[in-house]
From Swiss-Prot:
Organism this protein belongs to: Symbiobacterium thermophilum (strain DSM 24528 / JCM 14929 / IAM 14863 / T)
Protein name in UniProt: 4-hydroxy-tetrahydrodipicolinate synthase
One Pfam family recorded for the sequence: DHDPS
Compartmental location: Cytoplasm
Signal peptide: none
């Protein structure tokens, strides 16, 4: 099974001024992110505004990004949903686009119990021949997949190869203490990157790497080299950026940050709205203070 890389970016979806998906810009953004140090890209995840993309748009995005960078880095398709049968169908369709793996979010809104989570993920993963990464984000889904459920899936389903985890460090430690060999954990929260690494996480599926990819690469490389003081210094320097990008709902400020740093990707789609002038100015100050502007 592939490792996918330590620094992955949850890619935004570029839009034209009238709100259509800008596929050409998506290919350009993919190349831009790879040049900035990303070892893999997650397409049509939360940051990619997946709830407001049609299946047809998502499939074309997968094809676009695979064509642009699939020969260089891993491309992971966000195909999870709260409908098991639909997630199976869509995951099979996505597999035919040439992606290297799937990201499967915990079912949201219907709030399944732990046994429901187990059966859902097992059914989806066993329906495809691609490696699957689970995605636990309780703040978005209102359900927390417990470590025991994650570990059960890791042991029982060979192509479930890792998890993007957004719970606290204690939950991460519980997962890592019982994980089978080769099972990877990526932080799903930029602000938790260094704490997660110290407990044993493999890397991060990042949002901030849209604008501070090289710096995050420096942080990870310093940690892996045993230079924890340098890694901590990078973490402290980048923490205001991590926090600033999430001052309002993601990906509103990530798209604003890309515009401010000279790589515009268009607006967000309703029901999200673009950053206000005040929000953008506050973000500009954060980016300038961090040396990004």
């Amino acid at each position: 099974m592939p490792t996918f890389g330590r620094l992955l970016t949850a890619m935004v979806t570029p839009m034209t001024p009238d709100g259509a998906v800008d596929y050409q810009r998506a290919g350009e953004l993919a190349k831009h992110l790879v040049a900035a140090g990303s070892e893999g890209l997650v397409v049509s995840g939360t940051t990619g505004e997946s709830p407001t993309l049609s299946h047809e748009e998502k499939l074309r995005l997968f094809e676009t990004v695979v064509d642009a960078v699939g020969g260089q880095v891993s491309v992971i398709a966000g195909t999870g949903s709260n409908n098991t049968a639909e997630s199976i169908r869509f995951s099979r369709e996505a597999a035919r686009t040439g992606v290297h793996g799937l990201l499967l979010v915990t079912p949201y809104y219907n709030k399944p119990p732990q046994e429901g989570l187990y059966r859902h993920f097992r059914a989806v993963a066993e329906a495809v021949d691609l490696p699957c990464i689970l995605y636990n984000v309780p703040s978005r889904t209102s359900v927390n997949m417990l470590p025991a459920t994650t570990l059960r899936l890791a042991r029982d389903v060979p192509n479930i190869v890792g998890i993007k985890e957004c719970a606290d460090v204690g939950q991460l430690a519980d997962i890592l203490s019982g994980a089978p060999e080769g099972f990877r954990v990526w932080s799903g929260d930029d602000a938790n990157l260094l704490p997660y690494l110290t407990v044993g996480a493999y890397g991060i599926i990042s949002v901030a790497s849209h604008v501070v990819g090289p710096q995050m690469r420096e942080l990870i490389d310093a940690f892996l080299a045993g230079d924890t003081a340098r890694a901590a210094a990078w973490h402290r320097r980048l923490l205001p950026v991590f926090r600033g990008l999430f001052a309002v709902t993601n990906p509103i400020l990530v798209k604003a940050a890309l515009r401010l740093t000279g790589f515009p990707v268009g607006p967000v789609r309703l029901p999200l709205v673009d950053a206000t002038e005040e929000q953008e100015e506050a973000l500009r100050e954060v980016l300038a203070e961090a040396g990004v502007l």
